[in-house]
């Protein structure tokens, strides 16, 4: 059996410039997510310019500290524990990771258990494993370093513009996806121009195809 590299299947590699396609706007506004879902990288791939919102208020039950992978028993959510924010309006950039519960070890073991039998896991594991042995004080820094790694592996140009302050009024022609890519939002709204394509998944025969995973 000849396997396709899932990273190339899900988001085709590009060379030097961001590519504008269906659903992409002149400038895209995103939030920082933990191992963001495929839809997120689809937007990054197609957007000519990306601004990363770092002054948005941290929100629970979002992808800011949670990713979803395909486990043996179905979708598995992995959440990075955070310290209690000093106020209900604490900015994402100021959210601190709580070092309790041995979460790094648990997350890495879950990733290995879920993907160790996939054709390309050994090829990529050395890139990702160090993130689960290093201490990051801030959630945003952890998320962004992982995003930079995934962008490099996918061949997506890495530079983004970090917002100097919260963008309350979105400029004309911009696409605001800060709250669009969210576990509570319907995937097939078409707002981001992302439509899932089938690719190899380890547990597909048991669970069916799981869309928009974080891997």
Where are these regions (language model features)?
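N-terminal amphipathic/hydrophobic targeting modules at extreme N-termini
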Residues: 9-11
């Amino acid at each position: 059996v000849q396997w396709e590299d899932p990273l190339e299947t899900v988001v085709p590699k590009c060379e030097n410039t961001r590519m504008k396609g269906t659903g992409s706007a002149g400038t895209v506004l995103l939030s920082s997510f933990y191992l963001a879902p495929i839809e997120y990288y689809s937007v990054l791939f197609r957007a000519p310019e990306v601004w990363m919102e770092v002054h948005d208020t941290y929100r629970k039950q979002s992808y800011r500290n949670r990713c979803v992978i395909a486990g043996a028993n179905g979708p598995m959510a992995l959440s990075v524990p955070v310290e209690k924010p000093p106020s209900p309006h604490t900015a994402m950039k100021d959210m601190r990771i709580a070092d309790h519960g041995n979460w790094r070890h648990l997350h890495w073991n879950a990733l290995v258990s879920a993907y160790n039998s996939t054709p390309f896991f050994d090829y990529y594991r050395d890139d990702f494993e160090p993130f689960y042995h290093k201490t990051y004080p801030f959630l945003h820094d952890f998320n962004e370093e992982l995003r930079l790694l995934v962008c490099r592996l996918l061949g997506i140009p890495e530079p983004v513009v970090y917002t100097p302050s919260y963008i309350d009024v979105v400029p004309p022609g911009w696409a605001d996806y800060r709250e669009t890519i969210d576990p509570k939002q319907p995937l097939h709204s078409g707002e981001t121009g992302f439509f899932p394509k089938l690719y190899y998944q380890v547990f597909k025969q048991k669970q069916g195809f799981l869309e928009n995973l974080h891997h």
